[in-house]
Amino acid sequence: GVTCSDLAAEASKKALAAAGVDASEVDLIIVGTVTPDMMLPATACLVQDKIGAKNAWGFDLSIACSGFLYAMQVGVQFVATGAHKNVLAIGMDVMSSIIDYSDRQTCIIFGDGGGAALIQPSASKEDGYFIDFLHEVDGSGGDYLCMPGGGSQFPASAQTVADKMHF
């Protein structure tokens, strides 16, 4: 099937083409996802290879719905400090790979998709700029929407699969 890195690579190619930037000019790739292709390596590393961004390094952020916004904020910080000039911020999820379709309360609200944006320094405010970011989190509801299987609390096993802990 189609993987997270497949979709992320396609979105990245489109973002680079729209900006007129070659993949070899990308410095950093940040992927916000909770559905990586695998635990290791990072999806950003797989995207780096798939698009030919041989000079880029990258990492993933595991932040679910707001992953793209967090990837953008982190990318903006790398550009604002002058550390990098071309940062790909990607938000991508293949939720169909982890949805329990027998649970009608949740399966109808999730889907596959995402996008990519190239973040670069701006010569002037007329070119566009980020004003600010405001993020909040409330971890108190973590038990209501979670996938407990596969982490350090409940390592992947035949039992966690049988108990549907990976959905």
Residue ranges of model-derived segments:
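Conserved catalytic cysteine-centered active-site region
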Residues: V2-D6, T33-V87
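Hydrophobic pocket-lining "lid/loop/helix" segments that shape and contact the acyl-thioester
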Residues: D6-L16, C107-I108, D112-F167
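Phosphate/pyrophosphate-binding loops at sites that engage ATP/ADP/AMP, CoA/4′-phosphopantetheine
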Residues: A11-D27
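Short glycine-rich or small-residue beta-strand-to-loop segments that form or flank ligand, phosphate
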Residues: D27-T33
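Short beta-strand segments
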Residues: G32, S62, V87-D93, G111, ...
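Short, well-ordered, mixed-charge alpha-helical segments that flank or form enzyme active sites
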Residues: D37-L40, L69-Y70, M95-I99, G139-G142
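Flexible, glycine-rich active-site loops centered on histidine and acidic residues
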Residues: F78-G114
